[in-house]
Amino acid sequence: MSRAPAGFADFFPTAPSVLQKKRSKAAQDRHAANTPKAADPLPNLGLSSTPDIKGGVGTSADNPVRAVGERSAETTLALGDTNGATSSSSLSTGSSGFFSASAPPGVAKPNGISSCALTPLTNTDSSPPCKIESPLGSKSGSTDAAPQLAPTCEAHGGPEPVTITPLHTPPTPRVQARPANSEVKGHKITYDPDLDRKFPSKARRRKPQYETFGVDDEKDPPPCDPRMAIANYTRGAACKQKTKYRPTPYILRPWAYDPTTSVGPGPPTQIVVTGFDPLTPIAAISALFSSFGDIGEINNRTDPMTGRFLGVCSIKYKDSRAFRGGISLSASQAVRRAYLECKKEQRIGTRRIRVELDRNGVVSGRMVAKLITAQKAEFPSLEESRKESVGDNDNRLPIGDGAKKDNEQSKDNLPPSTAPKGPSGRSSLHPSLLAPDGPRAVLKSPVPSRIEETPILQQIKRDPYIFIAHCYVPVLSTTVPHLERRLKLYDWKAVRCDKTGYYIIFENSRRGELEAERCYRMCHMTALFTYVMNMECQPYGNPNYERSPSPERIKAEKREKAKRERLHREMELDIEEEKRLRVENLDPAREALSVLIIELRDKLLDDVKSRVAAPALYDFLEPDRHNAKRQQLGIPAPEGTGRPSFRIDASTDGTVVHSQPDAYSRHHRPGGVSSLNVLALPRIRKVKGFEQGNAVYIDERRRAKPRKREFRPLYHRLQQLHEIEDSDDDQQVSFARDTEEVESRPLSRLSSESAESDNEDDLMRKSPSLLDAKPLDVPLPESESLAGGIEQSGLPDREKSIIEELERGINTLPTSSKKRKRLIEELATRKKRKEVDNLFELDAKPLESLVEETAQEALPADSTDALRTVTPVLKDKKRKVKGQSGKQIFEERQAPKRKEIDSTQPLLFEESVELLPEGEIEISEPAIEELKPEVEWGVSTDEPRPTAEDDDTIVLDLDGWQSLIKDDEDINFLKKALSEHLAADIGNLAAWTWKHKEIKAINRGGDRGPVHSETRIDGYYVPNPSGSARTEGRKRIRESEKSKYLPHRIKVQKAREERLAKAKNDPHAAAAEAARLLAAKSLSKSTSRSTRVNNRRLIADINAQKQALPMQNGDSDVLRFNQLKKRKKPVRFARSAIHNWGLYAEENISANDMIIEYVGEKVRQQVADMRERRYLKSGIGSSYLFRIDENTVIDATKRGGIARFINHSCTPNCTAKIIKVDGSKRIVIYALRDIDRDEELTYDYKFEREWDSDDRIPCLCGSAGCKGFLN
């Protein structure tokens, strides 16, 4: 065992303090010896020397338990001295409980553990059977338990001598706060020799004297506090320098709640409102409580069984960054304002309301449960019927967990699990339940309210007034006296208020008008308590007031109204009479006869004009008939004797009018070129398969089945990309049959096949007219010259009209229509053919006129000069035709040799014409084949010239190199020059060359072959002053420069320029185009049947909302906004010609319709300014900041919808409005006018005008009313 370390007394045994402790300890020992009864009760117990099972005691020598008891008594005594006078009582109690056990202390349990183990936490209840009680047990079971425990212990084998060893520590004595009166509480010293100054220090050997106290507690009253004897001690009079005595703790001011550092629930953000009429609409409650802060959630509680309103409303507020004036308001502050304001007799309707704080919804839940319980007690029949239904369900269902759960729910006033989720609309259990009145309020004398129910604005006529809206200063009866005192410096007549706001009314005179204006100037936007008085001054009274008309005017209006009604009635009677006569005289045969007569008359007139009148006029105007008269008058003869061409157009503007093809007509083509010649019979071509193709109009089921596409490898498809072998018309079958809709009609061949056949006839007719040319002294046949002249003159106009008709059809059809796709392909084919014709200059000048002019120039000269004149012209003409045959190339090579041949003039002409034999002109696009450059070896006869002339201006691209290398010698030289360079891996050579040539053709607008200029866009490649763009730094490109090279802007700019030029040159065509656009706008905007059904349901839903909601200011905008959320207008964004991206309509939109909401992140003005600077620094040039009011801005730059892509226009088709929905402001885009499909949406940004500014933003809208700048 380890010894305790030596202390101070061991080293200094003669120290005064050590001696004093020894004397004190000796005095305590003597005092303990003098009082044995109170200190040690163990000697008073009679203990036998031998162990006795019945007695349960033994001597100290034979029984070791006694020794343990004595040691524990001594330890307890020592503790009792330390704690006061409580040790003797505790010791006596513990000893009596310990020694009163009936079992002998030495009895051990069968498991070898003694039952007398002393544990500090053992009590009577926790002791196991056959175990004596704890030494700290109660006295109640001390003697009665002995007879019961003795047999049990005997059953285990009788007494056995065991050694009892205490476990760990002895039991802790139980210290009493109030010991018995007979116990000594303590000792106090009455004489201390160390403090006696009468005796010298050497004589101070007397012993200290002690006196006990606590024995007679009744005789000795408790001593009083000596500090209370001092006057005003509790107020700090005892010591001025020390702190004031405070018997109670300080009442500190509570700390403000901080969610980051505070612990526990925060301040309440929810209130519960009662006392109003249960039938009050929720809009009225929201209008009142939204004046205290932004409402996050509002719930008008209902009965879950019947669905009726209970008159209890829970309102939860949310934090607002800028609430009515820019101040930030938290949800707890809003709740506090609402709670304090509604204590002052607030009313909703005619009832006073009561507001209570509801932190977690407990208060509202308790109120709802109380009201539901009251209703059950008031209508027991309804509850019994519900219980019966529930009981039937319980009988049908097995009893289990579900039934227990239903019982628990019924105990908690909740509906059962089998109950419906909401009230049924067809239930007959709807008794007339009385509305709860809410919590009882303190009855006070009713104060007359100064808030008028009748709108004040309707009562004001010409009196000057100032209006303060309720959204700036809440309407309260108590605010009116404060407002009157606030405006006491001004001479007003009355201050009135209604639910819209406050009206300060002045007298109706000039002085009143001036006083109203002065009050407005001095008090506008000033403070009234914590609100801002945003005033609206009307010095001339109600602007909407109209004086009642005079009696004479009323009489005149009545006479006019009666006259209009009379005329309307007479018109209706006439219409009814006409209908009746039509029904009586209805005869289909007579009606058909009248229609037939009209058509025959028109046809007869047309035949007379074309077959009788026109030939007669031309015969009369024949030049040969007037030779004598011309000679008599001295008029020279006309130059040509041939009959001039004659043309009859169906329309005066040059357009071709197409009609719907007749299903029973046998003429596949309309009146073509031959019908325009009055002297020629109509030529009807027999088309192969015409009967089968025309039968489709009669019955679409006779259409031939489309053949399947042949599968080809990718390489062959790449080579045959431009070969049109499979038509889309063969693959498409109409889904709508036997209808008159545009979608159900097959593609009309009036504008395609007829025009194609006409073009083919024209091209085939041009070559015979050229090949059959004869010397000029022989006149041509009249029919050939007339027909050729008509066709050549009418070809460009007819082709142009067909293209315009196709474009008009494309614009009128919807985007998803298959017919529109076919028309687009047809239009592209015709435009490509027209470009080829322009390239070959076929319609610029007829070939026969070129031959005639060449022949006329060749007549006066000799044959050699004529040959030199005619042959280069024809050769130059042939060079422009790419589809030449090998015979033509051979004739060109033989042309220099033919110069030496001497022949006559007619033979010369025929030789020159034979250069283009019949059938050798190939002007079809698929037959275009580039000629291989070759060297014509020969000897020049007139002057020396090089064998091959190289053009140095040709751009050396793929086509340029191919034109530069003409023979094998050039190939060998090129190989030697490139021998040092490694060959690049380009894969398939044919595919690589085809790809590069196609890219070049696309970039150059279809031009192929060698070119003399680089492929670039003018104005796009801007040279840098330093020679490198990297050394120039960052700079912004102007929008005007972007318009020069961006493809979509170039396209729009070209279209705009062409439109303006066309309108300037041909005003009639511009007027026709405007009429077409107007007709397109007036087209039916009908949609599919399912869409119409959905629209009808939506309208019914909106009408139901209109009936449910009260009609207040702004309700129409709210309803239309709800409609917008349910059915959004289909819009899309794409590249815009104005700026970057734009928004386009995907369907026709009517005027005043809501299109889309401008959504984004709501920020304050200061944050918006900071973000705008940050965006400019980061390179985001576009601004998507939209201001709602003075302090709030919507930022849609990074968090926004597609409405931010709407561009600016000086003549827009949309406008932006700010509406208020559920207490928050929203930005919605409206349509100003009817918007067509695929039209870009624009609105006016309304930037402030900046004068003499260098940083003005140019406007690129390109409209007729463009101002040039946005600011």
From Swiss-Prot:
Component of the Set1C/COMPASS complex. The lineage of its organism: Eukaryota, Fungi, Dikarya, Ascomycota, Pezizomycotina. Residues 1-99, 119-183, 382-447, 722-797 are annotated as: Disordered. This is Histone-lysine N-methyltransferase, H3 lysine-4 specific. InterPro entries: COMPASS_Set1_N-SET (IPR024657), Nucleotide-bd_a/b_plait_sf (IPR012677), Post-SET_dom (IPR003616), RBD_domain_sf (IPR035979), Set1-like (IPR044570), Set1_fungi (IPR017111), SET_assoc (IPR024636), SET_dom (IPR001214). Residues 383-395, 402-411, 737-746 have a biased composition (Basic and acidic residues). Pfam families: N-SET, SET, SET_assoc. It is an enzyme of class 2 (transferase). It is found in: Nucleus; Chromosome. The keyword Kinase does not apply. Belongs to the class V-like SAM-binding methyltransferase superfamily. It catalyses: L-lysyl(4)-[histone H3] + 3 S-adenosyl-L-methionine = N(6),N(6),N(6)-trimethyl-L-lysyl(4)-[histone H3] + 3 S-adenosyl-L-homocysteine + 3 H(+); N(6)-methyl-L-lysyl(4)-[histone H3] + S-adenosyl-L-methionine = N(6),N(6)-dimethyl-L-lysyl(4)-[histone H3] + S-adenosyl-L-homocysteine + H(+); N(6),N(6)-dimethyl-L-lysyl(4)-[histone H3] + S-adenosyl-L-methionine = N(6),N(6),N(6)-trimethyl-L-lysyl(4)-[histone H3] + S-adenosyl-L-homocysteine + H(+). A motif (RxxxRR motif) lies at residues 1092-1097. One of its GO terms (cellular component) is chromosome. Its main location: nucleus. S-adenosyl-L-methionine binds at residue 1245. The RxxxRR motif forms an adapter helix that bridges the nucleosome and ubiquitin. Residues 1255-1271 form the Post-SET domain. Its EC number is 2.1.1.354. Keywords: Chromatin regulator, Chromosome, Methyltransferase, Nucleus, S-adenosyl-L-methionine, Transferase. Residues 1129-1246 form the SET domain.
